[in-house]
From Swiss-Prot:
A Gene Ontology BP annotation from the UniProt entry: rRNA processing
EC number: 3.1.-.-
Alphabetical keyword list: Cytoplasm, Endonuclease, Hydrolase, Metal-binding, Nuclease, Ribosome biogenesis, rRNA processing, Zinc
Gene that produces this protein: ybeY
Gene source species: Thermoanaerobacter pseudethanolicus (strain ATCC 33223 / 39E) (Clostridium thermohydrosulfuricum)
Residue numbers binding Zn(2+): 125, 129, 135
Major subcellular location class: cytoplasm
Source domain of life: Bacteria
Protein name: Endoribonuclease YbeY
Reported cofactor(s): Zn(2+)
Pfam families registered for this protein in UniProt: YbeY
């Protein structure tokens, strides 16, 4: 498994986040029983950079906490990635995650939990998007929330 992490901001201290993000990604893959010959790219950015990305890709001109860019195609069921070949030894990219550490810090203070907990949650949330989950409907939202909570519980990260 390859996890590529790029800190492209200097407004929030990112020390110790790499190990946390790697643990979250590995846990999501375990929960979803996805093989480990995958590659995920994670970029830490500030609010200005994520605002620009959000405007370009989603037409929303404001900062958001996390953006997910899946590279794999999915079958009709969650987490079953068609393009990942289980027998292949070649590492296969499944997508990119972009997290605004500035927004994560703001939200951690707003919600009254640690910054690390917020980054872990955003990573789990985004990984589930990379694996085909969404929250457009109430049913999808419920399923995704249960998966997020399972990942956070396995990591022993509470609110």
């Amino acid at each position: 498994m390859n996890i590529l992490i790029d800190n492209r901001q200097d407004k929030v201290d990112a020390i110790n986040l790499e190990e946390l993000v790697e643990k979250v990604i590995k846990t999501v893959l375990e929960v979803e029983e996805v093989i480990d010959n995958v590659e995920v790219s994670v970029s830490f950015v500030d609010n200005e950079e994520i605002r620009k990305l959000n405007k370009y890709y989603r037409g929303i001109d404001k900062p958001t906490d996390v953006l997910s860019f899946p590279l794999a195609e999915f079958e009709d069921t969650y987490g079953e990635v068609e393009e990942i070949e289980e027998d292949s030894e070649e590492v296969q990219p499944i997508g990119d995650i972009v997290i605004s550490l500035e927004k994560a810090l703001e939200q951690s203070m707003e919600y009254g939990h640690s910054f690390e907990r917020e980054v872990a949650y955003l990573t789990a949330h985004s990984m589930l998007h990379l694996l085909g989950y969404d929250h457009e409907t109430e049913e999808e939202r419920k399923i995704m929330r249960e998966k997020e909570e399972e990942v956070m519980a396995r990591l022993n990260i509470g609110r």
